[in-house]
């Protein structure tokens, strides 16, 4: 599973004890939280001994009495003892994300900051092609060495 940061929230599915849930990937949450209205009535829960900070004021906070088996979005095996409260959507916290091997990466730019500034001053808009109608090549291509040892591409 992969998601590029955009205006859309990073949401993925997980299967807990055989039941599918959808939740928001939340790297700022220490623990995973299941929305009270999605918690199966026959699954045991208990009043939580600790409150939840950072999600506003939650009057009823519960925790699963059991450690539950979970499959991540790419069938990663994990376990979770989620908190349960009245929130609009489930949150997958670092307790699960770490077990799933989640990573946050910021790839290095393809071009130097100087070349990016020059291109921007020339009217280049990221994601658009070059040319009058902005329909030219949108991704860079790699120069290949000419193996015939003649013409452009031959290393001198």
Swiss-Prot record:
Superkingdom of origin: Eukaryota
Post-translational changes noted in the entry: Autoproteolytically processed at the N-terminus. Expected C-terminal autoprocessing not detected. The sequence shown is that of the processed Pro protein.
GO molecular-function term, one example from the UniProt record: nucleic acid binding
This protein's record includes keyword Repeat: no
Catalytic activity: Processing at the authentic HIV-1 PR recognition site and release of the mature p17 matrix and the p24 capsid protein, as a result of the cleavage of the -SQNY-|-PIVQ- cleavage site
Entries under SMART domains matching the protein: G_patch (SM00443)
Record function comment: Retroviral proteases have roles in processing of the primary translation products and the maturation of the viral particle. Endogenous Pro proteins may have kept, lost or modified their original function during evolution. This endogenous protein has retained most of the characteristics of retroviral proteases.
Protein name: Endogenous retrovirus group K member 24 Pro protein
Record organism: Homo sapiens (Human)
Lineage per the UniProt record: Eukaryota, Metazoa, Chordata, Craniata, Vertebrata
